[in-house]
């Protein structure tokens, strides 16, 4: 399953979020990926807890985001 967060960010802010996604995924030893979506960029993780940690980073950085239902 993949747990995704769609963020509305671009430029340096998006680069920063990519770095944070890498860091939280590396710490949890799981895979992740980012892909463009109609409403922004989706960051998808293999673990719901990592998605929650990434959402906390978005809140801290004041980035607009939405979570998606898990996909297989």
What kind of feature is each model-predicted range?
Residues 1-11:
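Short glycine-/aliphatic-rich beta-strand segments at the starts of folded cytosolic domains
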Residues 30-34, 61-72:
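Conserved short beta-strand edge segments in small beta-sheet-based binding/regulatory domains
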Residues 1, 34-39:
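Short glycine-enriched loop/turn motifs at secondary-structure junctions
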